[in-house]
């Protein structure tokens, strides 16, 4: 019996996995930056930075894989999405640069630590907001004519994209706070737990707002979620999201350490699954499906061989790094 694999679908899931890995791994780094002004100047800020110092730069590997995979496997989508979101992409990259430089120089230039702390927060906030707005710009639809972007410079700036941007900021803050609940102890952990409770409610409210907005955003989105028989297949996503949300709020009300972080990851997983269900099979709504934007099959197969070799290595290295630096963070840090 011959089994046929759709390489385009395989590549769609590879890129979705890379994006999810980036969001949840670099998300808590950015979340700590977003929350940084709420931490006490001195040891509390240092411990927060030390908790991510060994892993933050490696987490961005997934962003490179996701972006590079989009360029290689779906070149038409890459050629449309970038011109439509150039200001957001530029803002995101500049934010990541400021975040990275500030991370290193706050230790090497203690005389200007307040300046670097502000750059760390500003870069993290800008990067998170830009990523969320880019997602919103994609979901609301991009105008394509003759296989090229046909919109204006500011089509990405709408109330909906601002909502998705704020939702991403709140979600990253939740990841950052629950990461610190896991990695810190004492008064710093208690402070992180209080921040996580607020961030959890903000995330859930904004997720609900985005979900309701999606139903009126495009007719096909409402059909996907509200009509039979589609609703029977997609209903488990919001149901499981609700279950995870309740478990998360309960875990933050008791003295749990790692559980809130894992539940936050699960919340992100189901949130992104819901967005995937909403968009499928479009890679650039409303006109380009994954098959419309895909590279030739021989190119996809060639790249799949490379990914089959490199992705397990990346996963293994990432797992090893997190294992080596497991446990609570003390005052003596990576730097």
For each predicted feature, which ranges?
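N-terminal signal-anchor module of multipass membrane proteins
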Residues: 1-58, 64-67
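Transmembrane alpha-helical segments of integral membrane proteins
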Residues: 99-106, 278-290
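Helix-coil boundary and interhelical linker segments in multi-pass alpha-helical membrane proteins
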Residues: 1-13, 71-85, 139-159, 216
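Long, contiguous internal "core" modules enriched in hydrophobic/ aromatic residues
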Residues: 105-260, 274
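Membrane-interface helix-loop-helix modules in multi-pass inner-membrane proteins
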Residues: 55-126, 145, 224-232
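Juxtamembrane membrane-water interface segments of multi-pass membrane proteins
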Residues: 30-54, 71-81, 104-114, 176-195, ...
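Short, membrane-exposed interhelical loops at transmembrane-helix boundaries
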Residues: 284-303
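Alpha-helical transmembrane segments
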Residues: 11-22, 82-94, 121-126, 155-169, ...
């Amino acid at each position: 019996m011959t089994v046929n694999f759709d390489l385009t679908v395989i590549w769609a899931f590879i890129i979705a996995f890379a994006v999810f890995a980036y969001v949840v791994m670099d998300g808590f780094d950015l979340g700590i930056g977003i929350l940084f002004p709420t931490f006490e100047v001195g040891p509390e800020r240092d411990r927060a930075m030390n908790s991510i110092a060994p892993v933050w730069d490696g987490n961005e590997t997934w962003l490179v894989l996701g972006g590079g995979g989009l360029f290689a496997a779906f070149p038409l989508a890459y050629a449309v999405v970038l011109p439509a979101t150039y200001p957001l992409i530029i803002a995101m990259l500049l934010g990541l640069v400021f975040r990275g430089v500030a991370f290193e120089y706050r230790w090497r230039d203690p005389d200007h630590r307040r300046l670097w702390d502000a750059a760390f927060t500003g870069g993290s906030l800008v990067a998170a907001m830009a990523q969320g707005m880019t997602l919103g710009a994609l979901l609301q639809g991009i105008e394509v004519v003759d296989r090229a972007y046909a919109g204006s410079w500011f089509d990405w700036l709408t109330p909906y994209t601002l909502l998705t941007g704020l939702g991403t900021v709140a979600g990253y803050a939740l990841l950052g706070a629950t990461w610190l609940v896991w990695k810190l102890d004492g008064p710093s952990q208690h402070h992180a737990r209080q921040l996580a409770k607020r961030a959890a409610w903000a995330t859930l409210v904004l997720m609900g707002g985005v979900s309701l907005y999606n139903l009126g955003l495009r007719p096909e989105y409402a059909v996907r979620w509200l009509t039979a028989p589609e609703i029977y297949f997609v209903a488990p996503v919001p149901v499981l999201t609700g279950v995870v949300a309740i478990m998360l709020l309960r875990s933050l009300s008791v003295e749990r350490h790692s559980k809130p972080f894992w539940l936050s990851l699960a919340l992100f997983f189901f949130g992104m699954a819901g967005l995937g269900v909403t968009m499928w099979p479009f890679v650039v709504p409303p006109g380009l499906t994954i098959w419309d934007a895909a590279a030739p099959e021989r190119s996809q197969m060639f790249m799949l061989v490379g990914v089959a070799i490199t992705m397990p290595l990346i996963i293994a290295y990432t797992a090893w790094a997190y294992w080596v630096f497991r446990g609570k963070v003390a005052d003596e840090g990576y730097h």
